[in-house]
Amino acid sequence: MMKIELAVNGTLMRGLALNHNLLELGAVFVEESITAPCYRLWSINDQYPAMQRCSKGGQISLEIWRIDPSNIGELLGREPAGLSVGKILLADNRQVLGILGESYLCEGKREITQFGGWRKYKESSESEGSNFRSDSALTSNKNRS
């Protein structure tokens, strides 16, 4: 059965709250990677990130997973409104499908591009003792990426 590569950059990553959504659909971890330096990342209410391509941005850490293309719709159905699947350019010039955020979702939200990824943002937020919601608070909610 043919599988495709899918880049994820938020709570779907290994060890995070919604990674089980990938595992339940038979996805297999391939590698850690980073985007080309043309992406921006926002925190959506400290619950999940939204990434967008732009002309000038930064490199964002992500994970590449192999998944059956027939399961993409199911996975996307578990994601919140405003997240979708699109093409992502990696630092090594490969292009893969991945989770992206629509512009309306990011309006008025905190930009976290400077952290280089969701994990680093989360670690920084927790070490600062902020009101960051932990992934355990999201475990029961299947509607976040």
Q: What kind of feature is each model-predicted range?
A:
Residues 2-141, 145:
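Glycine-aromatic micro-motifs
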